[in-house]
Design a protein with these regions (language model features):
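Canonical Rossmann dinucleotide-binding motif of NAD(H)/NADP(H)-dependent dehydrogenases/reductases
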Residues: 2-33
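Conserved NAD(P)H cofactor-binding loop of Rossmann-fold oxidoreductase domains
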Residues: 92-97
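The beta1-alpha1 cofactor-binding region of Rossmann-like NAD(H)/NADP(H)-dependent oxidoreductases
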Residues: 39-40, 63-74, 106
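Residue(s) in the substrate-gating loop at a strand-loop-helix junction
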Residues: 144
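Substrate-binding pocket helix/loop in short-chain dehydrogenase/reductase
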Residues: 100-101, 108-110
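A short, exposed helix-loop element centered on a Lys and neighboring polar residues
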Residues: 124-125
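Conserved glycine-rich Rossmann-like NAD(P)H-binding loop of the short-chain dehydrogenase/reductase
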Residues: 30-44
């Protein structure tokens, strides 16, 4: 039996790191929900996994901007409505601005902070109540620079 058999994992982001995590979790038997502000990224991640043979019933995509707590809460609630639990949060959503620091605007910097830091806070805050209620849950935060 796989370690994540019938476990539900919510992954923030739908890029390469999120997809790699999803593949590993799917191999272990998990159901995986991606949340991302880009519908195109969600569609690409899910269609790519389906094309590789993964069961679409074990996949879910939710449009969600992690900068907004209400959207993270709605994403968590959508997962709970479909599968009844969230066992693990894997926070991978993040952005980088490719420009010299002395050319970066305050707005660009704030966007990085809002997604890479505040977004993690929002995602964690949105799943903790259901994890506390079940007295079970794992939170993994992945970042890179």
């Amino acid at each position: 039996m796989e370690r994540y058999q019938d476990k539900v994992v919510l992954i923030t982001g739908a890029g390469d790191v999120a997809e790699a995590a999803a593949k590993r979790l799917l191999c272990e038997g998990a159901k995986v929900a991606f949340s991302d502000f880009s519908q195109e990224a969600l569609d690409a991640a899910i269609s790519g996994l389906k094309a590789e043979g993964w069961d679409g019933e074990r996949l879910m995509g939710i449009k969600c901007d992690v900068r907004k707590y209400e959207e993270c809460e709605a994403a968590a609630n959508a997962v709970l409505a479909r599968w009844g639990q969230i066992d693990t949060l894997v926070a991978t959503a993040g952005i980088i601005r490719h420009c010299p620091i002395d050319e970066m605007t305050e707005a660009q910097w704030q966007d990085v902070v809002d997604i890479n830091l505040t977004g993690v806070f929002h995602a964690v805050k949105s799943v903790v109540p259901s994890m506390k209620e079940r007295k079970y849950g794992h939170i993994v935060v992945i970042s890179s620079i």
